[in-house]
Each structure stands twice: as C-alpha cells, then as structure tokens.
Amino acid sequence: MKIAGLDIGSTGCKLTIFDSDGSCLGKAYRDYPVKRTKTAHEVEAQDIIDSVFEVMEEMGRRHPDIAGIGVTSFGGTFVLTDKAGCPLHTAMLYTDPRGADECRALEEELGSAEIAAVTGLKPHGMYSLPKIMWIKGHWPEVYRRAEHILLMEDFVVFLLTGTAQIDYSLATRTMAFDINTITWNRKILSVAGVDERLLSRPVPSGTAAGTLLPEAAKRTGFSTRLQVVSVSQDQVAGAVGAGVFDSGKALECAGTVECLTPVYDGMPPLGGNAPGQLRGRPVCGAREVRDLLLFLYRGRADTVVRGHPGKG
C-alpha cells in the first residue's frame, strides 16, 4: 500500500509518496510567489491550489495507486471563498501586519487572561481572527459574499473532497478555538463579529474527509477511491514524524519561524510569556501538545536569493 503526505507551506507545497514500510518512493515540490511590503504580506490562494494540483498531477503519473493522502499546512493564513471554494481575495500571511488594531480591540473587550484561558494563546495579530475582523471592516463586500473561511489545510481538503473540516491543531491557530471544549468559542466570535457558520467543522487530527472528487481525480490522475485526511498543523506533524510522542520530549524546528513543540502528559499552566514569545495548544487525540512559537522577523533573504540566482 502507498500513502502520501501533502504539506502546504508559506512559500511552497510538497507531496511525498511512501510505501507501507515508510520508504520514500518520490516527491514533488512547487513554490509560489509571496508579496511582501511594509503594509502587507500576501500570497495568492489560487497559486497555492494550482501548485497543489501540479504536484499531485506529477505524482499521479508515477504513482496512481496510492490509497490515501494526508494534508498538513502552516497556521494562521486563511482565505474567504464563495460556495465552490473560489478565493474572494488575496490571502494574508500570518506575518502580515494587518489585524493588530483589531487584536487590541478584542483584548480590551475580553481581556488577555480570558482569551488565553480559552484559546491557550497570548492575543496577537498574527492569528486568523484579528485579520478576519480587518477584512470585515475594510473589505465588507468580500465578507458579505463569503460562504467559507478556510485555513490552508481545510482550503485544500475542501477543494479535493467538498468537505469543510479543520483539524483541532490548526484550528488553535485562529485565536477563536476553545482548547477546553474543542469547539469554536461563540463568545469570542460574537465579540469579533465573525459568523461561526463560515468556519469549517473542527475534527480530531487524522480524520478522513472523504474521497477525491471526480474532477480532482481526473485532473491529477489519482483514483476517486483515494482517501483525503485532515492531518494537522505542520509543526505537530513534524513532531510526530520525528518520533516525539512522550512527555519530556520536544521537536525544535527552524523554518520561516523557529518552533519548539514539546509533549505534556496534561495541560500545563498558562503562566506568562516572555516578550516576543507566542503560544498555542494544538490538541491531537488524547494528548495535549503545546506549540511554543518564537515569532521571528521574517527577512527577505528568500526574495534576494530568487532574484539573484548563482550569487548566494
């Protein structure tokens, strides 16, 4: 049996095929342009889904018989779509400065202690909810037309299967998810003025969304029997892949941001955060995992390297 992992990153996506012994049979990667200015950090959601179909088509020609594909993605970034999943705007990256004022307004109304107790997060504009508020305030027509608010994992899963579901670990990156009840928090959403109906249904990590839609199967070369699974936020998946299952172990991962993902036997006390540190609590099955993020300034090194080939 062959299975595949599809990871949606902030600058590119990768599809890797494995056999039942865990041996890598092949991989495909596509990057997509990210636009960064002083006032906006953006990526075209359509570029992401086009790249997803490109890597699936490449692997579909070589390994059309895979049984399932698990989807992971980076957190925070989302897109408002119409009923069919077509993007209504350019997606804001989690590093986008917009949403800071909206986050402060939420914090003033609810208090940082209440937000932290519910979501496990110190309020910050990097999370989805303040940016959704920004869109509602600045692009009201986009919000009015929206039928879905999708983060990148559930965006891809929805377009592949027609099912709008988001795993718990990625839902925590919105600042609207209650880690105690593992549901969307209606009070926070009400204060934010965001309709819960637009959000995907939260499900445990590793929940199958369904089989590949006929049009997606035709485009990629995979079977309509292919199962698509909502796996997790990328750092949680990385910890599992590194064998970090037991309390006292952690994964340190350096990418666009520096992440430390430790495992706990139970929910640790909130405590205080050092300046610049942000925390989330992805909840995966029976284990509680705290994802401690050090939010780093993202330089333009990738842009420089791409713009000057052979000089870096």
What are the language-model segments listed below?
Residues 12, 204-212, 258:
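Glycine-rich phosphate-binding loops at beta-strand->alpha-helix junctions
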